[in-house]
């Protein structure tokens, strides 16, 4: 009920939600009749692990769809081992360091995960995953083996790092390194798959900083947003080099008396994340396949919108904040091309700037970064020119106009009905005859 009220209060988001549900068609729908039982099961496992990622992966070009899906499941299996607090280091470390050997062992699976681990089913049915993995083109297998090996060893390093586990991240350099191991390496793997498929320009290969920024931007936004969730279980991913400028202990930010310092700290972290935004735009500008572009763009526009949500928001320190469903759907529909993504980044950069407080020590830095994002987005749009509209897009716009009218009328009638109901339960009574007889509104003398 709450989500419905949210949509009614934001008619444009309601319109987007209806459009997404009724008319949006994937560029490359799956043909289930050509899929093996094992492959269909892998996509079911993908749904178990992440419905949001499952939706965008399913819409990828057939050349890379299965490779990306299996890549995700394998890394999810690896992550499940690392996150399982019921497993001892003696069990975890050998598996994490030698996970590629496990992948090459016929029939290997792991059944000793915590029963409360939702994703343990991937480890339990790992032979099904590997059956389909072994059908991939060797070039994609090679990338996945390499990234999995590096991620597994990186995870093992953090598992045995007592200083990290007890004290969290110390410096900004260590913060970047952690985000690299968690997300940057994944971005490298996806970029290599994209290049091998011929879906990206040489710029992606020649400038690895772009793929690194894609991963770091996403991870840093998640880390800022998840402050309360992490601090409540004694995890700390905000770098001490930043937060210690504003408090003695990171958990102090939960206390309302530190609210001003807490907001200054988030603005410092937001500025750090915003530094990756222009690289993200450059990366997306060099993805040539439409479905791969959408796959890459959707997480990035969610990230910039989330950054606006957490910026100078005291709720971050009291609960886990997240975007409205309607906002998410609107962003998905808008992020269909480079021009749309540039518009989104510009819009949210302006919103961040407008929220800025001149008394915040990070005010100037945030303002400059927002200006750079807006200028860079404008440059990319100018170089590209206006995107040509297809017949399908024009038809979609006509449907959108009709839908907007329907939604507006629906909202008007819904609100009118609600007001009439409130009046009725409050004791007001009237009839059409009273209105026409002017008894409700007697003429003045």
Curated annotation (Swiss-Prot):
One Gene Ontology cellular component annotation held by this UniProt entry: endoplasmic reticulum membrane
Database matches in InterPro entries: Isoprenoid_synthase_dom_sf, Squ/phyt_synthse, Squal_synth-like, Squalene/phytoene_synthase_CS, Trans_IPPS_euk-type, Trans_IPPS_HH
Cysteines paired by S-S bonds: none
Enzyme class (EC, first level): transferase
Catalytic activity: 2 (2E,6E)-farnesyl diphosphate + NADPH + H(+) = squalene + 2 diphosphate + NADP(+); 2 (2E,6E)-farnesyl diphosphate + NADH + H(+) = squalene + 2 diphosphate + NAD(+)
MF terms in GO: squalene synthase [NAD(P)H] activity
Membrane topology: Multi-pass membrane protein
Cofactor: Mg(2+)
Pathway in which this enzyme or protein is active: Terpene metabolism; lanosterol biosynthesis; lanosterol from farnesyl diphosphate: step 1/3
Spans through the membrane: 291-311, 405-425
EC number assigned by the record: 2.5.1.21
GO BP, one annotated term: farnesyl diphosphate metabolic process
Keywords attached to this entry: Endoplasmic reticulum, Isoprene biosynthesis, Lipid biosynthesis, Lipid metabolism, Magnesium, Membrane, Multifunctional enzyme, NADP, Steroid biosynthesis, Steroid metabolism, Sterol biosynthesis, Sterol metabolism, Transferase, Transmembrane, Transmembrane helix
Subcellular location field: Endoplasmic reticulum membrane
Protein family: Belongs to the phytoene/squalene synthase family.
Biological role: Catalyzes the condensation of 2 two farnesyl pyrophosphate moieties to form squalene. It is the first committed enzyme of the sterol biosynthesis pathway. Required for the biosynthesis of ergosterol.
Annotated protein name in UniProt: Squalene synthase
Native source organism of the sequence: Yarrowia lipolytica (strain CLIB 122 / E 150)
């Amino acid at each position: 009920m709450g989500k419905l009220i949210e949509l009614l209060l934001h008619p444009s988001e309601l319109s987007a939600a209806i459009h997404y549900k009724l008319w949006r068609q994937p560029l490359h729908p799956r043909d289930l009749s050509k899929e093996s039982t094992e492959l269909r099961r892998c996509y079911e496992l993908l749904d178990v692990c992440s419905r949001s990622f499952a939706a965008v992966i399913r819409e990828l070009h057939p050349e890379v769809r299965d490779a990306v899906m299996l890549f995700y499941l394998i890394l999810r299996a690896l992550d499940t081992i690392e996150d399982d607090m019921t497993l001892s280091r003696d069990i975890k470390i050998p598996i994490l360091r030698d996970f590629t050997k496990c992948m090459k062992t016929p029939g290997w699976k792991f059944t000793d995960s915590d029963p409360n681990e939702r994703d343990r089913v991937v480890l339990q049915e790992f032979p099904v995953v590997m059956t389909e993995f072994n059908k991939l083109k060797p070039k994609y297998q090679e990338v996945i083996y390499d990234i999995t090996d590096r991620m597994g060893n990186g995870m093992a390093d953090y598992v045995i790092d007592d200083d990290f586990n007890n004290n969290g991240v110390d410096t900004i350099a260590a913060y970047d390194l952690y985000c690299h191991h968690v997300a940057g390496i994944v971005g490298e793997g996806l970029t290599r798959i994209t290049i091998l498929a011929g879906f990206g320009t040489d710029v992606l290969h020649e400038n690895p900083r772009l793929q690194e920024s894609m991963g770091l931007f996403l991870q840093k936004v998640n880390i800022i947003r998840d402050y309360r969730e992490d601090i409540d279980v004694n995890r700390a991913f905000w770098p001490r080099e930043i937060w210690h400028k504003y408090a003695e202990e990171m958990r102090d930010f939960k206390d309302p008396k530190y609210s001003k310092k807490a907001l200054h700290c988030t603005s410092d972290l937001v500025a750090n994340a915003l530094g990756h935004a222009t690289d993200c735009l450059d990366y997306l500008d060099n993805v040539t396949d439409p479905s791969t572009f959408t796959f890459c763009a959707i997480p990035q526009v969610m990230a910039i919108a989330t950054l606006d949500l957490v910026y100078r928001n005291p709720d971050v320190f009291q609960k886990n904040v997240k975007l409205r469903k309607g906002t998410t759907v609107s962003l998905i529909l808008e992020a269909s091309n480079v021009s749309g993504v540039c518009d989104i980044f510009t819009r949210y950069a302006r919103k961040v700037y407008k929220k800025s407080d001149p008394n915040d020590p990070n005010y100037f830095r945030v303002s400059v970064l927002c200006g750079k994002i807006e200028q860079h987005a404008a440059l990319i749009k100018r170089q590209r020119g206006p995107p040509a509209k297809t017949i399908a897009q024009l038809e979609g716009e006509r449907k959108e106009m009709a839908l907007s009218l329907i939604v507006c009328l629906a909202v008007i009638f819904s609100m009118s009905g609600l007001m009439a109901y409130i009046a009725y339960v409050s004791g007001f009574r009237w009839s059409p005859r009273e209105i026409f007889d002017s008894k409700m509104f007697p003429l003045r003398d």
